Amino acid sequence: LKQSYHEFYRIYGTDTYEDKVSPETIITEDSNSGYQFFEHVCIENGLKCESMNGKSNVFHYLNKHKGEKILVIADGAAFGSEIDRVLQVIHGRKNVALYLPESFEWMIMDADILKNNTVRSILSNPSEYVESKLYFSWERFFTAILIEQTKDTYLAYAKRKLNPAYLSGAIKESILRKMNIIDLNKKDE
């Protein structure tokens, strides 16, 4: 039995989603680069975006906002301890979807923006590359890889403040395209 660490980005909710997921609100569990990216996308598209400033706040937000069409974006690498509570609070609700990539850094690398064979190899089998003594979590591992692979380039990555290059047309679209059935485009009014 082989564990797979890069497939936990499927969309979770009451049902399996086959049609487009079109949220009105996006909530992210963090307030760093991932939130900054989605906040920018939401502003462009007239959607609401909020940071939960921590994974444990997702449950409380969903409990208070039962009528909104919400997409939760959280690092699958770190969200495991909250998944049971969150699935219980969204049980029976068709207006909430969970998108749980390994991390925002993983999303960037998975979008193949870097066109880097080392990154491709790491993503295809991360357990062959990670040293658990060095990295407390998969998120930290993927962050370290992205920082290392982009240093001294126009895509230089920093966790706390998103490089504006990631908000530009083709790069932004490459990241969003990996989200398959999630539609974050402007809503017709």
Describe each region flagged by the PLM:
Residues S127-E189:
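Charge-biased C-terminal accessory regions appended to nucleic-acid-, cytoskeletal NTPase
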Residues L1-S81:
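RecA-like P-loop NTPase motor core
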Residues K2, K20, K48, K55, ...:
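Context-gated lysine
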Residues S4, S22, S31-S33, S51, ...:
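Generic serine detector
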